[in-house]
């Protein structure tokens, strides 16, 4: 079954994956987040209902704070065509969902969309009861797939060339990201273990000032100015031994998914991919801290963590498994 993913009014250009996901350096959107759903099913990602092929049988409709009215019009058009329409929150972190539904009008529109759909789809277990309570007749839980089963998306680096810590989070101002705490703890590990530390700066001058204040005491702290093209970002990540974060936002887990493509452990988050692939719950910072130190110093523990996470990813998160789970939407 091919899936059309529709993001009404979105900024990402239309893309069709009928020939597969392609290679990382193609000039197109990477197969991450909801593009991954389109890619693994050899479907398409669209920003206007007019672009969705007329005979599309199943559409995944992305709901955002600013597109709910457009989404409702699109849903009505698609249902009139005979398409099955499943709804989902485009941004599904706990703080993002609270922002989406923190207005009476938006909550009413969201509930109308849920009740008018064929069902809901969520990449996190935490949203299953919410979508059901808002009116979805059925809710499917499908973790975000990653192309761990496609050799061209293997960004691994030889173990002997890996060193240090890559901080996976950003956004100092979002409390549930715990980004500052993650950076400070990583800085301490870096100085104690004499290993490199890389942090992405996505917040311009303000973020740079915070990071530079830490770098004065730690010459091993490297500030990477964002944004980077996705393949280049992965090529930086894979030079390190672990990905470290303390994100408690209950997100789908893209950072952990990125770590899977780099064949490296991700420690400290409570996202869906963190939980499935790495056994993380993000609840105990002390345990995460000890685990990170172990993986930085114990080669056997590192290799075991990589082997186990890759096995779980192939079983539950691969493109092949994603396509199988999405086929259930067509049969629903």
Give the role of each language-model region:
Residues 1-80, 280-281, 324:
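N-terminal pre-catalytic "stem/leader" segment of glycosyltransferase-like enzymes
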Residues 21-23, 148-150, 158-216, 223-228:
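Conserved catalytic-core segment of nucleotide-activated headgroup transferases in glycan assembly
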Residues 40-118, 122-129:
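Extended catalytic core of nucleotide-activated donor transferases of GT-like folds
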Residues 126, 141-154:
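Short beta-strand->alpha-helix junction loop in the catalytic core
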Residues 177, 246-256, 269-278:
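Nucleotide-sugar-dependent
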Residues 235-251, 264:
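Acidic donor-binding loop of glycosyltransferase active sites
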Residues 283-287, 296-330:
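A charged, aromatic-enriched C-terminal amphipathic alpha-helix characteristic of glycosyltransferases
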């Amino acid at each position: 079954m091919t899936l059309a993913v529709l993001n009404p009014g979105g900024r990402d250009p239309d893309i069709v994956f009928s020939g597969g996901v392609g290679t990382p350096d193609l000039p197109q959107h990477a197969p991450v987040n909801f593009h991954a759903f389109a890619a693994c099913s050899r479907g398409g990602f669209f920003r206007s209902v007019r672009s969705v092929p007329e005979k599309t049988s199943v559409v995944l409709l992305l709901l955002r704070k600013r597109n709910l009215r457009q989404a409702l019009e699109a849903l009505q058009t698609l249902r009139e065509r005979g398409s099955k329409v499943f709804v989902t929150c485009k941004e599904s972190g706990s703080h993002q969902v609270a922002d989406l539904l923190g207005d009476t009008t938006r909550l009413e529109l969201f509930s109308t969309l849920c009740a008018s759909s064929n069902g809901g789809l969520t990449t996190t277990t935490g949203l299953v009861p919410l979508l059901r309570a808002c009116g979805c007749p059925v809710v499917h839980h499908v973790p975000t797939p990653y192309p761990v089963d496609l050799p061209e998306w293997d960004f691994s680096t030889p173990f002997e060339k890996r060193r240090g810590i890559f901080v996976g989070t950003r956004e100092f101002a979002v409390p549930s990201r715990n980004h500052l705490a993650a950076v400070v703890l990583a800085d301490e590990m870096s100085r104690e273990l004499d290993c490199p530390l890389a942090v992405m700066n996505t917040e311009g001058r303000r973020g740079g000032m915070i990071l530079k204040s830490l770098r004065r005491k730690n010459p091993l702290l490297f500030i990477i100015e964002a944004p980077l093209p996705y393949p280049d970002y992965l090529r930086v990540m894979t030079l390190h031994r672990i990905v470290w974060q303390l994100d408690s936002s209950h997100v789908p887990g893209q950072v952990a998914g990125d770590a899977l493509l780099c064949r490296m452990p991700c420690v400290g988050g409570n996202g869906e991919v963190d939980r499935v692939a790495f056994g993380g719950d993000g609840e105990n910072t002390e345990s995460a801290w000890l685990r990170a130190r172990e993986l930085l110093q114990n080669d056997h523990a590192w290799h075991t963590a990589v082997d186990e996470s890759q096995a779980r990813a192939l079983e539950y998160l691969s493109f092949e498994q994603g396509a199988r789970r999405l086929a259930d939407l067509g049969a629903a």
